[in-house]
UniProtKB/Swiss-Prot annotation:
Gene name of this polypeptide: hunk-a
Biological process, per Gene Ontology: intracellular signal transduction
Major enzyme class: transferase
Keyword ATP-binding: yes
Source organism superkingdom: Eukaryota
Family as reported in the entry's similarity comment: Belongs to the protein kinase superfamily. CAMK Ser/Thr protein kinase family. SNF1 subfamily.
Keyword 4Fe-4S: no
Domain Protein kinase: 55-313
Record protein name field: Hormonally up-regulated neu tumor-associated kinase homolog A
Length: 691
């Protein structure tokens, strides 16, 4: 069983042994939806003949002397498995088959290794036994040899090394396979060896290596001479079989063949070392190692540890020593994300899940854990699991991936770099769907228009790189954050636009320069940004997941502003807060950056008259913008605007032209004489000398 792919707990693992369940939040999800959910199309498209338990029985993959192997689909996880189907009638008639079936289940529950197939579940019906194992999509190694005629030496070295590692693990556990052949070697999705079929294996842990076996087992072509001679044998019979498999990989044939077939003649060829000719392209080290494995005398034949230390086998594997795999998963290696998902979402008892996994007992609980964990591993590999050095638990790879996507692979950072290379202003408007906010939200939302100069419009020029860097010293696409007080903080508020687009359809709009934008005074910019900041504040945080319903199509909100200079603040201090002009609203005495907004509502009788004073065709724009845009009367419009989410603070590239003959919004609003005591006021006379 593979190691854990994710970890969702920070508590001590010893608490799990006591059966204590970790605290779980109601809204917490432990696995991504693509892992925890199974689509109906997956179940519908799987061709199957019947269903047994939680498995759909599909096409036949192979057929042996004792059973048939079919492809299956686990309906809980949507993962494919291999199912060995054994007929009960045949098993009961032959006690040897029944004995081998019981032995295979017992041995595979004892063993856990990456090059040995994992037994997941055992089912029994009225007519059949079902052994559920992990599926190896790479197929049989014999098919690969048939296609290529023979394998290259470096490829054969890889497979032989993996086979020896698996056999060494078996021998350390006291298990002798006795039936190692090409047909029992499968390939997984990563082109690695998987050893199957333990029907003829025997457990030497009970008898010990000092009392070897005496039964004749295995295929004669792969069997050691002592097996054919019905002599007592030990675990070195597997070493001989590895030599036969190595010869078959390198040549595509068997080392010892006789015509017509005779066990006595075959045995005599083995004893006489009458091996079929070897290809001349093989290296001397490979030939020497192969002859040592096919030594007919068991006393001269190397054991599995000596074979693993051979120089040819470890070529190109320097520094990769023998790694021992425990036959039981340790508690700290459990995938806590999968365990929590099973106990909280699938209804399994937490202590039962832990006990089944630690004991490696084949049942449906183990199958669910193994398949979900493998599914999570594939998900992390496909998403290019990052290498993050932070305070997150090193096993919590899913949460590391989410944090990496937000901090390292943000589209805004890549977009800003591209714009800087092209020398264009870094403006990127996106339309996002708005949510119908409650009245309390609308009352707390505020769009603040700022005063502007009464000077005529001048030709707009693009700000230089030094000017762009002076805007707070941060990228305009700096990440928007939520402070502890619930307010949104950002330094990218130069252009704002909020419109109601088509549902869930963000659109990218091309930038069109407007002649109504004013030039920022570079020489006075350092003093202005110390006293003035054009920002918008949202007094309550908005949960973006709750923004599902869109506003009515007849609502349209826009806020337009000129580029401003931002004072270099700490990220925690860049809170969106409103700034108003209270004492004097005359644009001749105070110079503000130009900002305006329009509110179009078909349900309001005055909505057709609303327009944007910054429009090129606006009368106020043609008359040197004589409207009082800095008036605090616009505070009345706060109740009409919904809460602003993070994705709604967007930069404007298009200025929508309003119909001619419309009056600005502030001319049809009554004056507001009393302001909320929570707003900070300042005297406009402090701005003297700056304009």
């Amino acid at each position: 069983m593979p190691a854990a792919a994710g970890d969702g707990l920070s508590e001590s693992p010893s608490r799990f042994l006591a059966g204590e369940k970790p605290p779980v939040h109601l809204e917490e999800t432990f696995l991504p939806a693509c892992i925890s959910n199974v689509s109906r199309e997956t179940l519908r498209n799987f061709q199957h003949t019947k269903r047994v338990g939680s498995y759909l029985i599909g096409r036949k993959l192979g057929e042996g002397s004792f059973a048939k192997v079919r492809e299956g689909l686990h309906v809980v996880t949507g993962e494919k498995v291999a199912i060995k189907v054994i007929d009960k009638k045949k098993a009961k008639k032959d006690t040897y088959v029944t004995k081998n079936l019981r032995r295979e289940g017992q041995i595979q529950q004892m063993i856990r290794h990456p090059n040995i197939t994992q037994l997941l579940d055992i089912l029994e019906t009225e007519n059949s036994y079902y052994l559920v194992m992990e599926l190896c999509p790479g197929g049989n190694l014999m098919h690969k040899i048939y296609e290529k005629k023979r394998l290259e030496e470096h490829e054969a070295r890889k497979y032989i090394r993996q086979l020896i590692l698996a056999v060494e693990h078996l021998h350390r556990a006291g298990v002798v396979h006795r039936d190692l052949k090409i047909e029992n070697l499968l390939l997984d999705e990563n082109n690695n060896i998987k050893l199957i079929d333990f029907g003829l294996s025997n457990c030497a842990g009970i008898l010990g290596y000092s009392d070897p076996f005496s039964t004749q087992c295995g295929s004669p072509a792969y069997a050691a001479p002592e097996l054919l001679a019905r002599k007592k044998y030990g675990p070195k019979v597997d070493v001989w079989s590895i030599g036969v498999n190595m010869y078959a990989m390198l040549t595509g044939t068997l080392p010892f063949t006789v015509e017509p077939f005779s066990l006595r003649a075959l045995y005599q060829k083995m004893v006489d070392k009458d091996m079929n000719p070897l290809p001349t392209h093989l290296s001397p080290a490979a030939i020497s190692f192969l002859r040592s494995l096919l030594e007919p005398d068991p006393l001269k034949r190397p054991n599995i540890q000596q074979a693993l230390a051979n120089r040819w086998l470890n070529d190109n594997y320097h520094g990769k020593g023998l790694h021992t795999y425990p036959n039981r998963i340790h508690l700290e290696d459990l995938s806590q994300s999968v365990v929590l998902h099973m106990s909280e979402k699938l209804g399994y008892k937490h202590s039962d899940v832990i006990n089944v996994i630690l004991s490696n007992r084949a049942c449906h609980t183990l199958a669910v854990y193994f398949l979900l964990n493998r599914k999570l591993e594939h998900y992390l590999v496909n998403m290019r699991k990052p290498d993050i050095n932070d305070n997150v638990c090193h096993k919590n790879q899913f949460h590391q991936l989410e944090k990496y996507k937000m901090n390292k692979n943000s589209y805004e950072e890549r977009r800003s770099k591209d714009l800087e290379k092209r020398g264009e202003p870094q403006q990127r408007p996106i339309q996002r769907k708005l949510d119908k906010c409650s009245p309390s939200h609308r009352q707390n939302a505020c769009l603040t228009p700022q005063g502007h100069s009464n000077k005529g419009p001048v030709k707009e020029r693009r700000s230089s790189k030094s000017e762009r860097e002076s805007f707070g010293g941060l990228s305009p696409f700096h990440e928007v954050r939520i402070t502890k007080t619930g307010c949104m903080t950002s330094c990218s508020l130069e252009y704002l636009e909020m419109q109601s687009p088509d549902p869930r359809t963000p659109k990218i709009m091309r930038r069109q320069d407007s002649h109504s934008q004013e030039t920022v005074n570079v020489n006075m910019g350092s003093r202005i940004r110390e006293t003035h900041l054009n920002v918008v504040r949202s007094f309550e945080s908005v949960n973006r997941e709750d923004q599902i319903e869109s506003l009515s199509p007849n609502h349209q909100y826009r806020v337009i502003g000129s580029p401003v200079s931002f004072s270099p603040r700490h990220s925690s201090e860049r809170t969106l807060s409103p700034i108003f002009q209270f004492d004097n609203t005359s644009p001749s005495k105070s110079h503000f950056n130009q900002a305006s907004f329009t509110y179009d509502d078909k349900s309001s009788p005055s909505s057709p008259e609303s327009m944007s004073p910054t429009s090129p065709h606006s009368p106020s724009c043609n008359n040197n913008i004589s409207g009082n845009l800095g008036s605090p009367n616009c505070v009345r419009s706060r109740g009409r605007f919904p809460m602003m989410g993070i994705g709604q603070m967007l930069r404007k590239r298009n200025q929508v032209v309003s119909p001619k003959g419309e009056k600005p919004l502030e001319t049809r609003m009554p004056p507001l004489h009393q302001m909320s005591p929570g707003y900070a006021s300042f005297n406009s006379s402090d701005m003297n000398g700056f304009c």
